Amino acid sequence: MIKEVIFDIDDTLYDYEVGHAQGMKKMGEYAQRELGVDAGEFQEAYQRLNREITERLGRDDAAIHSRSIRLQNLLEQLQKPLFPHLNRLYHAYWDTLLEISAPEPGSLEAVKRLSENGISIGIGTDMTVRMQYEKLERFGFAPYVKHIVTSQEAGHEKPHPEFMALCVRKASCAPEECVFVGDTFKKDVLGALDAGMHAVWYNAKGKALPENMDLTGKEYREIHHFDELAPYILSLA
């Protein structure tokens, strides 16, 4: 019997890429207007710095997601004043992303239906906490969420066993009574299966499976629309 469904947020409950592209555009426009830095050059420098920070911190540290840290370092490298531009760039990005983004079609309805059927709703996301709270409230998921695990809290990114174990521990049930739903195959699907959970791959964008991956004995469900989710979960329950 399924007692909890745990959702990834970015590119699962909403389309991150659409909002991200517009947020980056807005930051570039600000940089050109207020800092005298070409928008294209600003974005290239931002991406380069992002890679540098990831190399320095590694990929298992939630700090790699901190846009504030990236912007602080970028302004330092550009020899531009940190204040007031750091906070203004931060809000240019996030305010834009939140304004134009929306829940994935059928996602809110699926979460509501599962909750109404007595299934607890959890969140398992690679990110720092504050902005994930904002997204859940803005997109309407907050009233249904009982548990949240971020990589900032867990101390590891998905699919680390300790991240997944914390998800199960907060759910207060056995791993086989949990379903993890996400768009990233290695992190969300394999991470959940290795932890003993059921897994649903939300593949609305038609991604190909990662190459050279041994899936022997790995059973998971692939869906392309959230209309498919609740009937599948309830069939397990």
Where are these regions (language model features)?
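Short glycine/proline-enriched coil/turn segments at helix->beta-strand junctions
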Residues: 76-79, 117, 196-197
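Asp-based, Mg2+/Mn2+-dependent phosphohydrolase catalytic module
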Residues: 1-5, 18, 33, 40, ...
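Conserved acidic, metal-coordinating active-site core of Asp-based
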Residues: 92-98, 117-118, 127, 173
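N-terminal helical cap/lid subdomain that shapes the substrate entry/recognition surface
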Residues: 2-105
